Amino acid sequence: MMTGLSPKTHGDRVYSDRMEMPDVPTLAETFRKNGYQTMAVGKLHVYPQRNRIGFEDVILAEEGRYELGAVDDYQIWLGEHGYLGKEFLHAMGNNTYYTRPWHLDEQAHPTNWVTMEMMHQIKRKDPTRPFFFYCSYQFPHPPLVPLSTFLDMYQEEELEEPIGQDWLDDSYIFKAMCEAAGIYTEKEIKRARRAFFAQCTHIDYQIRLLIGTLRESNLLDDTILVFTSDHGDMLFDHNMVAKRCFYENATCVPLILSGKPLENYRGTVEKKLGTSYSKTGQFAI
């Protein structure tokens, strides 16, 4: 989305943690060169981690990826507030689907922290310039460690069972793709789905705070809000997890545009196939 390039062009075809960004103009750089104040808060997932990819500044929360050579701003904040080294004491992995409630204070949850930092930047905005702000939440991606407040909302909900299938049981490729999900019991799968939905609801509540901050800063009426994601999650549908295939749950992500400047388009639905890199030109128009 930031480069407007397909994997065929930018070269990262297999998810490479240590592949540097291509030397091309980015979406953030384009906005900045056209007079916009630019800021990113949350997860950028680029290498090296402190590469600002065209933003004037970034405040990072990168899921504790110490092996990539940088300490992010969330880790620094944890250390300053008595939580040094405690982020992963919940013992849940970044790519597993076991779950438990968040183990630290609510303010220390990455979703809350990213929201507060973004609210601060909205309040600190230069009043003489338009702005392009990027707020990126790492959740609901595992680890599945929701706040108990939101997990409790789903304890009594009868959730739909994962979609199953058996017509490819003799396919070696399909069996290999299902191995990652096959280690979980039926009870663990139900817990994982509840936790995933709870983390989505948590973000919904935090977005309310961001919208409220825009409103009280007299910015909401002139702001276009864009809600999107990089990928979905199979969440045990078809006996799979994560994003290893081109089934709908993994590839069909939201692209919702909202705001008073788009009032004439309220309720419009575009059903054409789109991609992450096709968003770049739309945002920059």
Q: Can you say where each PLM-predicted feature lies in the sequence?
A:
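Formylglycine-dependent sulfatase
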Residues: 1-285
